[in-house]
Amino acid sequence: MDGFISNGPAEAPATMPPPEPFERPPTPPPPPPEDSAAPPPPPDTSAPPPPPEDAIPAPPLEKKKKAGWGAKRAAATPLSVEELVRKKREADAAAAKPKFLSRAERERLALEKRAKEVDADRRLKTERTANGADSSSAQSTPVYPERPNSDKRVIPTGPRAMRNTEAPARSGPAATRNKNYDMTPPAPPKPMSFSLTDSKGDSKRQAEEDETVAQVALIKQRYMGEEKTSNFSAKKKRKRTTDRKFNFEWNAEEDTSGDYNPLYQHRHEANFYGRGRLAGFGDDVADSLAKKYARALEDRDQEAGSIRAREMLEMEKRRREESTRNQLDKHWSEKKLEHMRERDWRIFKEDFNISTKGGSVPNPMRSWEESGLPKRLLELVDRVGYKEPTPIQRAAIPIALQSRDLIGVAVTGSGKTASFLLPLLVYIAELPRIDEFEWRKNDGPYAIVLAPTRELAQQIEIEAKKFTQPLGFNVVSIVGGHSLEEQAYSLRNGAEIIIATPGRLVDCIERRILVLSQCCYIIMDEADRMIDLGFEEPVNKILDALPVTNEKPDSDEAENSAAMRSHRYRQTMMYTATMPSAVERIARKYLRRPAIVTIGSAGEAVDTVEQRVELIAGEDKRKKRLADILSSGEFRPPIIVFVNIKRNCDAIAREIKHMGFSSVTLHGSKTQDQREAALASVRNGSTDVLVATDLAGRGIDVPDVSLVVNFNMATSIESYTHRIGRTGRAGKSGVAITFLGNEDADVMYDLKQMLMKSPISRVPEELRKHEAAQSKPTRGYAKKSDESSGFRDKGAWQ
């Protein structure tokens, strides 16, 4: 080749300048060295090659003038800290500020990015092909960047000091290049010369991956907890503790005591006679031994042996019946009263859901025979038809017979009337007859029974006369709706028991028709209802009018039954379904160390009533639903329908008559004769449906009510409890259907809680998910009006 020498300096012809860089083809890469070939000698860098003789010398380079000490330099203005902070703040603000990009711009940027990636991949493949690297060693082979064409020079232009431009950029390993010559043959490449960069990148990438995995593990442990892994290893050697293990100096097989000692070879069988028995033997073995002993007695003693054997067998039979194991296995109903243990009484109370408190309280009675009532009274109980006592009767009668003050908390329809009438008759029977002397008639009754409504007072009077007429006691009711002259005439012969409403009794006391000089027994039935109707002040007046000579002491003696029976102290009993604060206030003031009996939980409905709740808004829809219920034939009369306001009673009664059913109404605007006639028509079966307000919700006993419909939900959960208590009485089952609306939000929470506690009722999904049923509402001082009875409530803290 002209002007080209492989191992020496290049010499160009003198007549021709070197070709331009763009006219020459690119220099091919050097071939890879053979394994057997020796590396080329190092280049001689002692002196630069001389320039060609015929070549035109290059123009001399202009020397830069050195600036001396006196030369003026351009003053450099330093950047202030404020300027740097301002620029950084502007850069951060610009980076943090979101930049809106249109869809076209986003597509353009994506296409540009993709084009750059494709271009980079194509360039990488081209370089690998040009360098002769295969795909298997692509990671370890370095990638050489392409040099621009303007920097590719082959022919030297002279010493570096005489060149116009800087030294061209060289590619390839530094060991294969000659610092002064461009065309020196390259040295063989070192295989690990460029692996340092890749190993550093791989190690950095591996460190980042390890850090990411560690962060993920920490986050998982933070939110999901630590994994429960066992550290137990079966292969791990464990040191056995032999500190407490006693090692004999001889082995067990060396023991020869069993060979020569006959005590170990022939064991003696113990024989126990009579009441003796081997531990662990059953009753059958004991019986066989007893019979064996009895036969031995008969054989040895011909005269009295048979008698002794018979007595011994009877004694063994008694012992077996009264054994501790047999008594524990028996149910409380199979045991005798003297065999009842504390555990049996606890089970008995749990069976009847009885809870008592208040000092030394006697155990409940299991049957009428164990009640302690006189024989004459037990005969009357059997004649009336009381077969088994109710839970409140089981618990309250023994306490009342010990002359203790009593607070009975029980649901409606649980037999509370008999629970206070029977102890009252026992108390009065021990007093002198009231008609024995004329002055006794004028001193007033022995006992007073207070009831909140006229209907309840008359109902108690009917129930009391079943017992008082055979015993010769006189019972008089004093209620509103009748003239005072008529009631004064009924008191002319005196009365042992007076059943009255608080308002009318206060009128009689203030008009001197009645005095309470010898009253020694007070019963308040439905005390919470009396407070709700605004009778707290009349009740306080009546209790303050009682004599103080026979008042109980407020000490431990009030809990001593013997001390209370020795002196005729006044006895006070209060029955209620709920315990508001006003009732507790009266109890603290007038009762002395009372025993409290609770059947179930205060304010709960009976378990025999199935409660159904339907969310129906609007009068028309409710009337249509009521017609469907009555026409279904599922429920037999009598049926009670409750409304909230008395003017709706007549409207609902007319609708029911249009449906083909007979109906009567009961509310506060009715006269006493109309009320009695309405209740009588329902009780004797001549009327199918009774439409009433809350007046009939407390204490009215209509037998065999199969259905109660709350056309309007009660304003309080207590009223609702007594409404549905009209059915499911005396152990019978019943159904209560309630129409609920958004206006009843104040009682939804309590209603849902009551339905959840009932084992036979279900909470509808609409009520369960209703907003008002999620938390108990906070109520303030509300003044409410009871339109059904005509009394205005004084208000109470709810």
UniProtKB/Swiss-Prot annotation:
Keywords in UniProt for this one? ATP-binding, Cytoplasm, Helicase, Hydrolase, mRNA processing, mRNA splicing, Nucleotide-binding, Nucleus
Q: Which Pfam families match?
A: DDX23, DEAD, Helicase_C
Kindly list the places in or outside the cell where this protein is found, as annotated in its UniProt entry. Answer: Cytoplasm; Nucleus
- Which segments show compositional bias classed as Polar residues? 132-142
Residue span(s) of domain Helicase C-terminal: 608-771
Which residues lie in Basic and acidic residues bias regions?
A: 112-128, 763-773, 783-798
Query: Nucleotide-binding: present as a keyword of the record?
Result: yes
Q: Which InterPro entries match?
A: DEAD/DEAH_box_helicase_dom, Helicase_ATP-bd, Helicase_C-like, P-loop_NTPase, RNA-helicase_DEAD-box_CS, RNA_helicase_DEAD_Q_motif
Swiss-Prot/TrEMBL catalytic activity: ATP + H2O = ADP + phosphate + H(+)
- Name all Helicase ATP-binding domain ranges: 397-597
Q: Which stretches does UniProt call biased (Pro residues)?
A: 15-60
Give the residue ranges of motif DEAD box: 525-528
**Its domain of life?**
Eukaryota
Q: Where is this region: Disordered?
A: 1-79, 112-212, 761-798
Q: What is its EC number?
A: 3.6.4.13
Kindly list the positions annotated as binding ATP. 410-417
Q: What is a single cellular component term in the Gene Ontology annotation? A: nucleus
| Any GO BP | mRNA processing
Motif Q motif is found at 366-394
Entry remark concerning the domains of this protein = The Q motif is unique to and characteristic of the DEAD box family of RNA helicases and controls ATP binding and hydrolysis.
> Subunit structure, briefly?
Component of the U5 snRNP complex.
Q: What family is reported?
A: Belongs to the DEAD box helicase family. DDX23/PRP28 subfamily.
Describe the function of this protein.
Answer: ATP-dependent RNA helicase involved in mRNA splicing. May destabilize the U1/5'-splice site duplex to permit an effective competition for the 5'-splice site by the U6 snRNA, resulting in the switch between U1 and U6 at the 5'-splice site. May also act to unwind the U4/U6 base-pairing interaction in the U4/U6/U5 snRNP, facilitating the first covalent step of splicing.
- What protein is this chain from? Pre-mRNA-splicing ATP-dependent RNA helicase prp28
Origin organism is: Aspergillus clavatus (strain ATCC 1007 / CBS 513.65 / DSM 816 / NCTC 3887 / NRRL 1 / QM 1276 / 107)
